[in-house]
Amino acid sequence: MVKKWSVSYPAVNGVEQRRVYVYLPTMYEADPERRYPVLYMFDGQNVFFDADATYGKSWGVADYLDYTDTPLIVAAVECNAGPNNERLVEYSPYRFDDPTYGHFDGKGQATMSWFIHRFKPFIDRNFRTLPDREHTFIGGSSMGGLMSLYALLQYNDTFSRAAALSPSIWVSPEKLSGLVGRAKLEPGTVLYMDYGSQEMGNHEGMRREFACLLYTSPSPRD
């Protein structure tokens, strides 16, 4: 079951209404005492329904979780799909310049602040979640993958696991590398990161180098 409604969201140009999607597992209603881990996701319009997806094809997450009977809540928020690359601003934690897109004042830190201080508490109040760090995950692809990676490193006291699918490391590889060096990760932190072998530019090589940096970084806490 997927619930869908709108919330006030701190958008690039002020506050606007955004669609929120919350998936509840098949056994949610049958056992009113049971609580569940939560996966927070970016680009919510692409997570569940083809009719809402940006390019007409969703990830089909609800279908997969129903099929596998996975005990997991998924909470997702749609992005700003405006014509002026607002999504790049909303999902970048850093300012950056790009020869194709120009200059962007990244608002990703404000986006994450809303997720942690507004959205997560709302989900925890209104659904039977396991709100602790161990059971709180985050995921996304492309710019959403970048935000998931950033969230795991910067807010490791909130998120214990992240899925960063083809993360847009190109936005600011130097600042991300610095964040890896500074991050104090709790034991048991898990990151899934992938990339395609036929992606444009040097994205594959950049992600491979970053994966090696993550793997060799002595960041977990004692």
Placement of each model-derived feature along the sequence:
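A domain-start/cap signature at the N-terminus of enzymes
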Residues: 1-37, 72
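Active-site machinery of serine-nucleophile hydrolases
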Residues: 50-104, 112
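Alpha/beta-hydrolase-fold catalytic nucleophile elbow
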Residues: 78, 165-166, 194
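Gly/Ser-rich "nucleophile elbow"/oxyanion-hole loop immediately N-terminal to the catalytic nucleophile
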Residues: 96-137
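Primarily recognizes the serine-hydrolase "nucleophile elbow" in alpha/beta-hydrolase
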Residues: 134-177
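The feature captures the conserved acid-bearing segment of alpha/beta-hydrolase catalytic domains
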Residues: 170-214
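Conserved small/polar residues in nucleotide/adenosyl-binding loops
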Residues: 215-222
